[in-house]
Amino acid sequence: MNKFNKFYNNISEYYSNNIVTNFSPSNGYRLRCEFGYHNNSYLMHKNDKKIYLETFENAASCIQDLMPKILNQININESLKEKLFQINFRSNVNDDVMVSLIYHKKIDKNLIDIIKDISKYLKISFILRSKNYLYSTESTYFIDYIHNDAFKIYQTDNCFFQPNKFILPKMINTVISLINNPKDLLELYCGVGTFTLPLSKIFIKILATENNRNSIKCLNKAIITNNINNISNSRLSSNEVADLFMGKIFKRMGDINLSDYNFSHVLVDPPRSGLDDTTIEIIKNFKNIIYISCNPETYIDNIR
């Protein structure tokens, strides 16, 4: 039984209507890729085995094209190779690319000068990371555009962003299509605002929560850039949101008051581990729940 049929069988107990399945191409779809570096190659692990590669067919074509070029630059330069252990890529709808090189050593001026030259040569931005240190050849923010380029959105090199460039627009459009009689929205795990920004045109007000500091910074930057005035956000975990609804006061909420909201919908986009019991107890009191999941097993477990 393939994964689709397994999910259809598991969900049938709770949902009997037609299920629409969207597919992306099997290659060239990933906007975000992370690799180790070992033996002069990119390194991935699968089924406890090491896989060495020079390019990665699942990555967006702009990343695929760059991977051998960057690998060559690293391998011919001992300063770049030394104690390099991870190489991350991010790309966007314009095929811009940000590359992060992560080291187990102090980043010195020589390394910075080398990466500046490579950045100019390849016409891409680089991030150099080591413990408690970050250097960027350009901005530490990576810009992308969503919802038919209607919104400018920001990422950092280490915050979560939906990786599939073909499925993401369909996800946003599907969420929008599910909304009827919108009033105010509570959003948990809002990230950098992938859904928050387009939904701001549908709901009267949005209270968005997220535990990651960098993601909140990206969202705040996007709110200002896109001239949006109906999104409030706070750095809260899902457990803290549950505590908030049970009366706990958080200084991080500032002047945000729950009593000012008339929530008609809640949207959750949790990690693969799904929702904890406390969060489920809170959101099940909402009439309309939109649950975006990357793990069908925890999704089924949560809706039970």
Predicted regions and their residues:
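Extended interfacial segments that mediate partner engagement and assembly in macromolecular machines
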Residues: 1-84, 93
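Short, well-ordered strand-loop elements centered on a beta-strand within folded domains, enriched
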Residues: 40-47, 95-102, 133-135
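Rossmann-like S-adenosyl-L-methionine
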Residues: 2-6, 106-304
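Short hydrophobic/aromatic beta-strand micro-patches
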Residues: 36, 90, 100-104
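A short interface-forming secondary-structure element
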Residues: 56, 99-109
